[in-house]
């Protein structure tokens, strides 16, 4: 037998859990309703899965050291849904990461689930929430801001979240079916890129409705603003510049405060978040003259076609300037085509605690190298055409949500909890870190891993870029480069520099096309496995199409005894162990919920 089965172990639960029915007296802090609605995006009606009727959904505000309850209703006919708290996986209660078939069962149609989240000191920053089922993320997302419990690390006068999204005219189901079909059908590029739901493709006076107008960012003169760029795009990496406002300072990346880093433009990929400080012009400069409005230009990068749009930075002046009659004939901002050098080896964490905890190369116990490329699971590549079923694979092995669902897979975390089933560590060492039986990567508490993603161009010879995202605790981002990873050479960067903790960084491409099956490009992470980050976590490409096609991995940190010791004993968790169990409420049945954190029990 290739799995280890451990006998049920005693649990110490009472100290950190209460088992309660969430009846009519329970009042969640936020309510999200997932529905299938016809909404206008890019001035076209689209049947879309949304939260609370809009895309993006409402902004959620959390605070460090406070527990927040968020109730999610699934009112989508015949569809599951989950919500993933992107960048805050480690702060969600057990069975609440939002990853179906990994950390929890999805929420069935007609039911609801109460998510419990508690950020800690050091988590203040920019995040977002989104569905983690199929292609739903393309419209089912919203901003999530964690506020500082203490005085913020940087001073600013205003705080402006800006969510970036992709717009596809085709509906989710059509796109997903094409990606999984035989023969495979690619989704194509998005029809538009949106900021705060606006595509910026039409002028204020020509647009049939506001959804294709530029989004307007209102500012006051002589102030400093924190611009939080949050990318919920399905596919697009964007470059963005603000006319006549090139002096930006990065102060945060993926929820981690950074030492200030000067830059003249924004670059953000699916799943990434950056905060930039921008000082506005004086009142004399803008309100005393004839120009108080400035174009914001954004363009996609590293894709076959450039998708672009505009937003507008508008100053508040006593003399109100009318909105521009038309979009610029030529862009007033020139954006670089170079992507792979953006802030590489430039972002150092502000947290002295995290900087001191950075493991050196001499502490690394194991390096796991994962080569990413396309494979054909049926058919063949003939005359430049992928004629068959296409998957994205890690070391030759795809992980597809639909395949696992068809196999009626029980979520990994629940398998561990109920049966003590964990990946076989010895077998994994024989297969480049991967256990082929459980289809998971195991790691032991005490290990320090270097995880190296390699970009291979597969049978077509074409490279893509991949924004790689880690669930659970963030990783020290070791940088990236062309060719393959050389640990000794790369470690030289860290003699007087400590990389910041991140959860989403790019595996870049360094050429468009080359000799097939060639590896050129790497991204490396470092993580220490401790008692704090034990659990079952995903690491995957945050391009939604690639994840649907199999570019995902599951990691199990810790052994069964350690993982199960993190959970309360039955009956506290009984309702989480089956699909639609008693932890999932209905119109007629109130849920029985494990209140995991102790500072707030409604």
Curated annotation (Swiss-Prot):
Induction info: Expression is regulated by the aurofusarin biosynthesis cluster-specific transcription factor aurR1/GIP2.
Ranges of residues in domain Plastocyanin-like: 38-149, 160-317, 421-556
Observed effect of gene inactivation: Impairs autofusarin biosynthesis and leads to a yellow pigmentation via accumulation of the intermediate rubrofusarin.
Binding residues annotated for Cu cation 4, in chain numbering: 469
Keywords: Copper, Glycoprotein, Metal-binding, Oxidoreductase, Repeat, Signal
SUPFAM superfamilies the record matches: Cupredoxins
Glycosylation sites per record: 52, 80, 201, 247, 337, 383, 387, 419, 424, 482, 486
Domain of life: Eukaryota
Similarity remark: Belongs to the multicopper oxidase family.
Signal peptide start-end: 1-17
Pathway per the UniProt entry: Pigment biosynthesis
Annotated InterPro entries: Cu-oxidase-like_N, Cu-oxidase_2nd, Cu-oxidase_C, Cu-oxidase_fam, Cu_oxidase_CS, Cu_oxidase_Cu_BS, Cupredoxin, MCO_CuRO_3
Binding positions for Cu cation 1 per the UniProt entry: 84
A UniProt-annotated Pfam family: Cu-oxidase_2
Gene Ontology molecular-function annotations: copper ion binding; oxidoreductase activity
EC number: 1.-.-.-
Protein name: Multicopper oxidase aurL2
Free-text function comment from the UniProt entry: Multicopper oxidase; part of the gene cluster that mediates the biosynthesis of aurofusarin, a red mycelium pigment which is acting as a mycotoxin. The first step is performed by the polyketide synthase which condenses one acetyl-CoA and 6 malonyl-CoA units to form the first intermediate, the cyclic heptaketide and yellow pigment YWA1. The C2 hydroxyl group in the pyrone ring of YWA1 is probably formed during ring closure by an aldol-type cyclization reaction.
Binding site for Cu cation 2: 86, 130
